[in-house]
Amino acid sequence: IVVHAAALKQVPAAEYNPDECIKTNINGAMNVINACIDNGIEKVIALSTDKAALPCNLYGATKLASDKLFTAANNMGGAAGTRFSVVRYGNVIGSRGSVVPFFEKLVKEGATQIPITDTRMTRFWITLDQAIDLVFEGFERMHGGEIFVPKIPSMRVTDLAEAIAPGVPHKVIGIRPGEKLHELMCPEESAHETLEFRNHFVITPATTYFGDFDYSVDGKGERGQPVEEGFEYKSSTNPHFLTVEELRDLCSVSASAVPVGFSGQKSQTSEGTASKSVH
């Protein structure tokens, strides 16, 4: 199996340097697809992002293109060929370039204000270990062509700032180039293609790539149900928001405190930064 986790992911940087983002996130995706087919890989999962759903920035647009390439790649493999699916999730706690280490650095430096882009901003939230668990569960459940979306909590950026820097005043500095106020993982426009399972959603392929799979029953035998018309899975309307105390625990104590995803089990694997083959 192969996990494709390589990407240029900094939203503002992509706005200023679109060519490098396109080369890595789109051309790089095609390189991985072709290499996997040429080498007879059985299953491939590409990591996606909430920014790929109705993207308003270049990074999200390149990841949407990557998602489309990986799901459509099932055509290239044929009925007995390589199977490709996608796992889409939100912000990974403490990942490189994320807001957690930035806030923590400010606290260590004795900052008297914490910069907040917008007090209304919300994000989906997941730990490193849980993100990896989702990938390996995806391998067990996939038929090929699906986009797996875990049910994960949301957080308010103001709550995160309070968790890391209690009592420190916030300074609103405005949204950065390409940023959204709220993130989306299942857009309303895909509701007719979306199935709900116990701990996750599946966005099914718009076209049949091969065979005659019933996507409502996954590879582990769990049956999903169609979502209601007009359904969307958005960080601002998510029924599960992390509290300040939960955020503080996640940032300072453990990266396994939130029971989310397919199995909710802790993995001992760290997040990768490139495509990986697992034997």
Question: Where on the chain are the PLM-derived regions?
Answer:
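Extended, charge-enriched "interface" segments that sit outside catalytic cores
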Residues: 1
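Conserved Rossmann-fold NAD(P)-dependent oxidoreductase catalytic core, especially the SDR/UDP-sugar
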Residues: 4, 8-64, 68, 72
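Strand-loop microenvironment adjacent to phosphate/nucleotide-handling motifs in alpha/beta enzyme folds
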Residues: 68, 72-279
